[in-house]
From Swiss-Prot:
Spans through the membrane: 11-31, 44-61, 67-87, 100-120
Membrane topology designation: Multi-pass membrane protein
Disulfide bond entries: none
Annotated localization: Cytoplasm; Membrane
Major site of localization recorded for this protein: cytoplasm
Name under which the protein is recorded: Transmembrane protein 196
Example of a GO cellular component annotation carried by this entry: membrane
Keywords: Cytoplasm, Membrane, Transmembrane, Transmembrane helix, Tumor suppressor
Species per Swiss-Prot/TrEMBL record: Pongo abelii (Sumatran orangutan)
Keyword Transmembrane helix (UniProt): yes
Encoding gene (name): TMEM196
Function field: Acts as a tumor suppressor in lung cancer. Inhibits tumor cell growth by inhibiting cell proliferation and migration and promoting cell apoptosis. Inhibits metastasis of lung cancer by suppressing beta-catenin expression in the Wnt/beta-catenin signaling pathway.
GO biological processes: negative regulation of canonical Wnt signaling pathway; negative regulation of cell growth; negative regulation of cell migration; negative regulation of cell population proliferation; positive regulation of apoptotic process
Source organism, top-level taxon: Eukaryota
Length: 179
């Protein structure tokens, strides 16, 4: 079973990979845009959702709060959808033209790697959330157990201090006299 530190480390590595993919995708998009302007050809898709996904992943690894984990999961899902749509768009464009094939292949490869990274990041986020949930339940259980122990000690202390200092012997009932 992975520890929280291992999960966070893996999440950081994947987030840096996603940022790299996002920057690379933006660069490929800029090159394709300049080529599209010169040749009047359709522009390639853009995988910049991976950039946003990577930034949210680093934030998630640092904060570890529930809200940030939900935000990161949403970004991963958006990255998955964006990557799949980008891949499908590029596949359709590649069939029509072959002059930009190396650029299309690079964009499709970035989209595939980004899809894989988003999938792994989503899985790791679920693992991290599960780990944090177990940790919180364990802390709550420990705290509850500790509060019960303290309550029992207080009750014993109250019982001891409420006793009179000298023992009181109950009176013995008198026996009836015989006639």
């Amino acid at each position: 079973m992975c520890t929280s530190g291992q999960i966070i480390g893996s999440l950081l590595v994947l987030s840096v990979l996603e940022i790299g993919l996002g920057v690379s995708s933006v660069a490929v998009g800029a090159v394709s845009f300049s080529l599209a302007l010169r040749e009047h050809k359709p522009q390639l898709g853009d995988s910049s959702p991976f950039l946003l996904c990577g930034i949210c992943g680093i934030l998630c690894a640092k904060k570890k709060s529930g809200l940030v984990m939900i935000l990161f999961s949403a970004c991963c899902i958006c990255g998955l959808i964006g990557g799949i749509l980008n891949f499908q768009f590029l596949r359709a464009v590649t069939k029509k033209t072959s002059s930009l094939y190396p650029l299309h292949l690079a964009s499709m490869s970035l989209a595939c790697i980004g899809i894989g990274g988003c999938t792994l990041s989503s899985w790791l986020t679920c693992r991290l959330a599960s780990y944090e949930q177990r940790r919180m339940f364990s802390e709550r259980e420990h705290s509850l157990h500790h509060s019960h122990e303290m309550a029992e000690k207080r009750l014993r202390a109250i019982e001891i201090t409420d006793l009179p200092s000298c023992p009181v012997v109950p009176p013995t009932p008198e026996l009836p006299t015989r006639k």
